[in-house]
Amino acid sequence: MPNEFELAVAALQRDGVIAYATEAVFGLGCDPDSESAVHRLLAIKQRPVEKGLILIAADLAQLQDYIDLDQLTSEQLARVEASWPGPFTWIMPARSNTPAWLTGQFTTLAVRVTAHPQVQALCRAFGKPLVSTSANLTGEEPARRVADIGELLASQLAYILPGEVGGQANPSEIKDARTGAIIRPS
């Protein structure tokens, strides 16, 4: 019988959208390389593609196919790396081949290396980062427990990975890697 990670990875490989615990809230995730999965996630969230999305990864290496580290100075990269793994999301220059279904209207991409052990294990088992957005409809309170994921939302998910959110009170802070400007405070 498959374990919970195997079921979650199988759902991701079938272009499904899953829910999983992150540092502060439950997230919705999917395969960032699957346009159909990303559009399914956006439809569930009722979120416009133009806003762009966040990728969450087990380590920086998992993000290198999506972000252009050559556009950062060594000081900028050091600042980013010093905050990871952790609840810090950075806006980084996207590679020219990073799809618009991830970047939205931008030439940048929001990325995070998670400190949440279950998410790290999930990204490692899947072999790449996940699209990550809060498990709620746009404008509603995010889910902090499996029980908080509404029936409407749950019915549209391929799998809900049981787990506990980390100790963060708020979703991750978002900063611009080049300027250090805070886009969303924690």
Curated annotation (Swiss-Prot):
Any GO MF annotation of the entry: L-threonylcarbamoyladenylate synthase
Localization per record: Cytoplasm
Enzymatic reactions: L-threonine + hydrogencarbonate + ATP = L-threonylcarbamoyladenylate + diphosphate + H2O
One Pfam match: Sua5_yciO_yrdC
EC number of this enzyme: 2.7.7.87
Gene Ontology BP term (one): regulation of translational fidelity
Domain YrdC-like span(s) in chain numbering: 2-186
Keyword annotations: ATP-binding, Cytoplasm, Nucleotide-binding, Nucleotidyltransferase, Transferase, tRNA processing
One GO CC annotation: cytoplasm
Record bears the keyword Oxidoreductase: no
Keyword tRNA processing set for record: yes
PANTHER family membership: SUA5, THREONYLCARBAMOYL-AMP SYNTHASE
Function: Required for the formation of a threonylcarbamoyl group on adenosine at position 37 (t(6)A37) in tRNAs that read codons beginning with adenine. Catalyzes the conversion of L-threonine, HCO(3)(-)/CO(2) and ATP to give threonylcarbamoyl-AMP (TC-AMP) as the acyladenylate intermediate, with the release of diphosphate.
UniProt record similarity statement: Belongs to the SUA5 family. TsaC subfamily.
Name of the molecule in the record: Threonylcarbamoyl-AMP synthase
Species of origin: Aeromonas hydrophila subsp. hydrophila (strain ATCC 7966 / DSM 30187 / BCRC 13018 / CCUG 14551 / JCM 1027 / KCTC 2358 / NCIMB 9240 / NCTC 8049)
